[in-house]
Amino acid sequence: MSGLDAEQLDELEDYVAESLEEPWDKGNGRPRELTLREALIAASGYARNNITEEIWAEIFDVDQSTISRYIAFLTPLIDKATTEFRPSAEEAAQATRGAIALVDGTLWPCWSWSGERELWAGKYKTTGHGSLIIANLSGRITYVSDPVPGNQHDMAKLKGSDCEIILKAAGGVFGDKGFIGTDYITTPVRKPQHRDLYMREHDYNNQVSSFRAPVERAVAQLKTWRILFTDYRRPLKTFLSSFRAAMGLYFFKESFA
């Protein structure tokens, strides 16, 4: 349910317990409705499955408000506990320097909150936040940028960012048509307005797509943490911490592979 096995849960529980200001189980007074492990299963499982708090409440036989309170409390702690597992820009630059890199933009969908028009992503025809993902040729993710409002296209996300620094140090970069206009990213040929693509251009585009396939698979693997794939429902102000917690859990789990 949590997306983590018993060993991984043990380690995460240790990390989170160390960051608590006071013990989860004080040994006196009214006991908590859930143990720390159970609460972590609910909070991690919410990121993994993005099922409603009401269903988690039924699973643990507690009130929905209890689940909501524990998710709100533990998500920032999971974010903090897994920080070291999320690749930094410096680590990504070192891993990418001189190597072939792949880059792709993606959207993390969310509800269409009133008054938040900048979340509308025309490319995807829905609302959300966008990030750039960098991977190597084997599909291992080396960097995920922090999310920005969905109305920013890939080139806007790239310009002046850590991703730009990382990719410019690579030995070569493949991206999709969203990166046409850069002089260091190999992209497909865009269809001219007044003619079809030549056969050689089709072949070239197919070659570029084959190189890009690993990063597309990597993005799909990231989105098995369903909070990144289906509409984010919690208050908008909580998204960044939830995003970082989900990313942290992904890389934390990968560290056991």
Regions found by a protein language model. Give the residues of each.
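Short secondary-structure transition/capping motifs
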Residues: 1, 31-32, 45, 60-63
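Short, well-ordered secondary-structure "scaffold" segments embedded in the functional core
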Residues: 52-257
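A cross-family signal for key residues in well-ordered alpha-helices
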Residues: 13, 43-44, 159
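Charged, often Cys/His-bearing segments associated with DNA-binding zinc-finger transcription factors
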Residues: 1-30
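Ser/Thr-centered flexible coil motifs
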Residues: 5, 35, 198-200
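Glycine-/proline-rich flexible loop or hinge segments
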Residues: 23-28, 50-57
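Short, amphipathic alpha-helical "recognition" segments used to contact nucleic acids or chromatin
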Residues: 35-50
